[in-house]
Amino acid sequence: MSISNMTSTVWPDLQVPAVEYNHLPILTVALLTVIASAVYINVSSAQDPYKVSSIPTVKRPRVLDAYRSGVWWRIFVPRLVPYIEEGYHKYNKNDQPFRIWLGGFQTYAYVLPERYLEKIKNMPESEASFAAMANKYFHTGLPTGEVNNLVLQVASKLVNGNLATIKTLMQGEVQKALAREIGSPRQWTKINAWQVARKTTEAPGLRVVFGEELANDKTFVTGVSEFVSNITVYAFTLRYINLGPLRDFILYLVHWRHRRSLPAVLTPLNNVITERKKVRSNRHISDDEESFDCIQWALDQPVSDDCKTAEAIARRLVVISLGTIDTVAGVLVKQLTHLASHPECHEAIRAEIRECLAEDDKGWTLKSSARMKKLESFIQESLRMSSGAISLSGMRIVTGPGFRLDDNTILPRDSFIAIPTRNILYDPEVFPEPEKFDPFRFYKIKEDEKNAGPLSNRRDIRASWLAFGYGRQACPGRFYAINAMKAILGEILLKYDIRLAEKQAPSIDIDLDPMLAPARSTDLEFRVRA
């Protein structure tokens, strides 16, 4: 029985109209659905016009990392090094980039294969910038002021250009610092490695940056030491928590207490800068009267007037002091630990130092230091094993329209790019037996290359020694840092015997994403040589 007949039987007076099927509404809904889907797909694809989503992601599971490492707090700060290693072998070794989340910077880093080193080597800041990366992710503007051309000019051109004279000053300051911190103990005496590294880098760093007057002002020295020591601590406070759009505001509040300690540094520094400006405006200053320090070099720079106010210069010099003191100390403490762990190389390095100093009756000069190839090899090997202060190098922010990869994928503006330094330095195809500390590895490689002649097809190892970055935007203070390390390690070897305080080799660094922070609890033992 049809529905119409059933209805008329139950309700005889009800008239049921004949049903005519109209397919137009159904077709309209279907068409609108297709259009909406097309629009959605188009919008979705428009959000990735550069094909960035095609780059694989290496994940860092927090709970699993805490379990693997056996450290509970890794739930909040998972390690970075093991996962970069995973991406390096899975993707970079197959000539592919990958991306990985940097908790300390709250952004993805696009980690590029080694062959991109040549592409970024000579890139100008208008295309990819290290300074922009430092200002954005280290928030240098919060405690002091952003890295600008004045900082780069003073650090790269003037400090490096005056290294011959700086070297003499540096050696004298190091000798005085060692006399204060270690003295002349006849018996083995235990001293904290970080304390030795900090004080021996602080002495020459203060003298070169702030001049003799302020370097001998105990109140000023204490203020600078405390402020610089806290820069890294405050820099990573709350950085591992996703604060969303409130991030910059909250970090500004976090740095408030840190900024309160800045006047203790800026006030006396401002006074010195103002006085020098006043003297120069009243009379001609001869070359012999010119002060030899970064204050003077900053005053002499051809930069705009707003960058040369006493306040502006003072703030930028504090940024430079971070590099000459705290950063160098963080690397040096690892080298002291390596030195104490490998007594078998001490006599060979000592003999070379004595020989080089004897050839130059002027003592520790830039020329004599440059001939200390075994000491330099030790420093390079220590940097290779510890990767310096960070596990990535070549860090830049893309400042141009985009960074084109070979497969036509383009990393858009503001992308964070980097090279996997630590993994390249631990690659057995680059350095055989990478887990072994060989203090004369680089010395032997250079001797082999020298004997092979200019037609050798050997791999350029300089492209694999990346602790100071690479190319035109590498660390501007690297030459100062290397000479400071030579001065300190050389003086220690000549004057002291050194060994580990504990029989078991201590840890060298701590993986704190993206930093490789030095272990500050390591104790060493020193004894003056007969």
From Swiss-Prot:
Statement: the UniProt record of this protein carries the keyword NADP: no
EC numbers, comma separated: 1.-.-.-
Phenotype upon gene inactivation: Abolishes the production of the ophiobolin family sesterterpenoid.
Broad enzyme group: oxidoreductase
GO biological process terms on file: secondary metabolic process; terpenoid biosynthetic process
Enzymatic reactions: preaspterpenacid acid I + reduced [NADPH--hemoprotein reductase] + O2 = preaspterpenacid acid II + oxidized [NADPH--hemoprotein reductase] + H2O + H(+)
Pathway this chain belongs to: Secondary metabolite biosynthesis; terpenoid biosynthesis
Keyword annotations of the record: Glycoprotein, Heme, Iron, Membrane, Metal-binding, Monooxygenase, Oxidoreductase, Transmembrane, Transmembrane helix
GO molecular function, one term: heme binding
Chain segments annotated as transmembrane: 24-44
Needed cofactors: heme
Family recorded in the similarity comment: Belongs to the cytochrome P450 family.
Annotated function: Cytochrome P450 monooxygenase; part of the gene cluster that mediates the biosynthesis of aspterpenacids. Performs the C22-oxidative modification of the terpene synthase sttA product preaspterpenacid I to produce preaspterpenacid II. It has still to be determined how preaspterpenacid II is further modified to produce aspterpenacids.
Protein name, as recorded: Cytochrome P450 monooxygenase sttB
